[in-house]
Amino acid sequence: MRAAGTRAEGVLLAPYTTLRLGGPAKAFAEADTAHELVRLVAEADRAGEPVLVLGGGSNLVVADEGFDGLVVRVAATGVSVVADGDRMLVTAEAGEDWDALVRRCVTEGWSGVECLSGIPGLVGSTPIQNVGAYGQDVSQTIAGVRS
């Protein structure tokens, strides 16, 4: 395992996609914090290097030729919970596994996302894709998104 934020060359992307497809990235890095993600993307932008921000790798097909630029995998994790009267405010980092978060909410008895179990991906991509199933979608429960 490489240190967060350090670049590696030629990392195969197949292990990072749910379809297990994908050739090498010209450069690959993992961002363990939002600050690290911003830094890596900003550096690549300044250098004119193409950037792919990678979450859980679902809904993503990478060619056998790979990606001719920097792939930054979102790896920031952490969940905090604050009670607000009879409501719970759950804050999750973008790199948290979505289904694991749903399982925790169900286990704790927090309603609102229970129908969204089994959907692959990370927390950070769920609002972008407006994940939904069985008449429930994340737009009904998200109070805010930090970008």
Where are these regions (language model features)?
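Anion-binding (especially nucleotide phosphate/pyrophosphate-binding) glycine-rich loop
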Residues: 1-147
